[in-house]
Design a protein with these regions (language model features):
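Serine-hydrolase catalytic machinery in alpha/beta-hydrolase-like enzymes
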Residues: 2-111
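Gly/Ala-rich beta-loop-alpha elbow adjacent to hydrolase catalytic centers
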Residues: 113-118
């Protein structure tokens, strides 16, 4: 069973016709891009879903626990990658997309956005 991510949600109007699932970068959280929503001039209702990545130790940061979509084991090109962490995060994001579909957002109106590690 996929663990549900905690989220911050903002709707720009009643009955949103669009959904944006927006992933933050390493060490940030779902509140990171919350202030940006007010800067958009959107013609119709949009639901922004800002999930919080799980807290996990990040190897390149001395194993310090922080919000991360996956562990970063090495910065070397072709170096080892946290395939299990990447897969788990992909499953969690996929679940958020399913929830938005269940709420009535058609696939052609569902946008996935990400910054830094959230966009990788």
């Amino acid at each position: 069973m996929t663990e549900m991510l905690e989220t911050v949600e903002i709707e720009t109007g009643p009955n949103p016709a669009w959904s944006v699932v927006w992933l933050h970068g390493l060490g940030a959280d779902g509140h990171d891009f919350e202030p940006v929503v007010a800067e958009f001039d959107l013609p119709e209702g949009v639901r922004f879903v800002f999930p919080h990545a799980p807290v996990r130790p990040v190897t390149i940061n001395g194993g310090y626990p922080m919000r991360a979509w996956y562990d970063i084991v090495s910065l070397d090109r072709g170096g080892p990658e946290d395939e299990a962490g990447i897969s788990a995060s992909a499953d969690q994001v996929r679940r958020l997309m399913e929830i938005e579909a269940d709420r009535g957002t058609p696939a052609n109106r569902l946008i996935i956005a990400g910054f830094s590690q959230g966009g990788a």
